[in-house]
Amino acid sequence: MPYTGRENYPYYQEELASPSALWSDLYALTMAQALWEDGRHNAQATFHGFIRTAPYDGQYLLTAGQNIVLEWMDKNWKFDEADIYTLAKKTITGPDGKEHKLFKPEFLEMLKNSQLDLTIDAMPEGELAFPAEPIFRVNGPLWQGLMVEAAILNTVNSQSNFATYASHLKTAAGGAPVLEFGLRRAQAVGGLSSTRGAFVGGADISSNVWAERCYDIPTKGTMAHAFIMCYEDELTAFKAWAKGMPYNGIFLVDTYDTLHGVENAINVCKENGLHLSGIRLDSGDLSYLSKEARKLLDAAGFGEAKITASNDLDRATINALKQDGAKIDYWTVGTALVTAKEQPGLGGVYKIGAVFDEKITAKEVDAMRDAVREGKKSPDEIRQHARELMKLSGDAIKMSYPGELDVVRYLKSGENGQLYFDGGTILSNWQEDPIKYKD
């Protein structure tokens, strides 16, 4: 499934999809052996991945990570010799105090020879999802559906969390460019997960060059305070920058005195006939300084120069600065975005919805689903062959919906608010508007 939410986004050289089939919690394997021993491991089953509540006090989730999961399943889901060795050496202490092998050799042989036989339906990345709507639907052998749970949740929870917060930042910025400059604060080596999720969610630019290599995410960067401080004074540093980077005329102006730094940037560009692309403010009263800097830039004839703000920005500070009339064109967000500081965890879950009789083969189930997609059968006919499953709980939000679930979405169009079927952004067995089959 290619990512369609952003133009020219590449199908992956996926650095994040490199683990083997052991990208899983151990209990998936212990359940798999118990099912295998009972002869039920290949029963056809259906699972759904979804959220229970929307993050950030909002109403939606901006989904991301689906392509990573699909790439991993397509290219790397297999048990190699190192995987089998890891499992073969696991032991458990029995009631007799002796160590026993956790996994049987015959079961490990089954794993070694297995190929992934799951059918995955998913919303496209960048699509909005709402609580209880399946983002993923997984059909196939019961044991394999259990095996991929952790990888799906690990990926889609984190990616969607970053993407959703980035979308909220973009809204707070009023559509102005949002720059993800948080690599040094990211909580994973390489920072790929947060940078990628932020880009899917609407961040325009990153500082992470590794992410550009892997995903072609555009990067930008100028100077740090260290560059300025290693020269005798700010003006000398700016002259050196202008000489070495004549087409990258963005100056960090707050190392010593911010407004004097703006004047130095103006003078250097005027003296050298350079285009002053912009300045960056990284400390102090960003609202006041941006307004004063704007006056200086406009008076000097650099009305097109952009003002970029940084310094631990988040959704609240951006909103406050916007309300105060700050003259900021670009918003640079680091820590708050790459750590999902407002809500570090997303509680997406993965639940079983149906299981078929072991005598019904995958080929037979696929034929039934194909008939539904072609409009020859209703989904009700599939339900006749499956045992629909529902998790019960005293906590209503933890109850799950039974059966094979679709997401059928209708959008309002025009002044009259006429509803129309949106077939391009759904997770459904239907290729056409299902309302026509409702009778």
Task: Mark where each language-model region is.
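Short beta-strand/loop segments at the ligand-binding rim of alpha/beta enzyme cores
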Residues: 113-115, 175, 296-310, 327-328
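Glycine-rich beta-to-alpha transition loops that act as phosphate-gripper elements at the mouths
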Residues: 123, 183-184, 307-315, 334-336
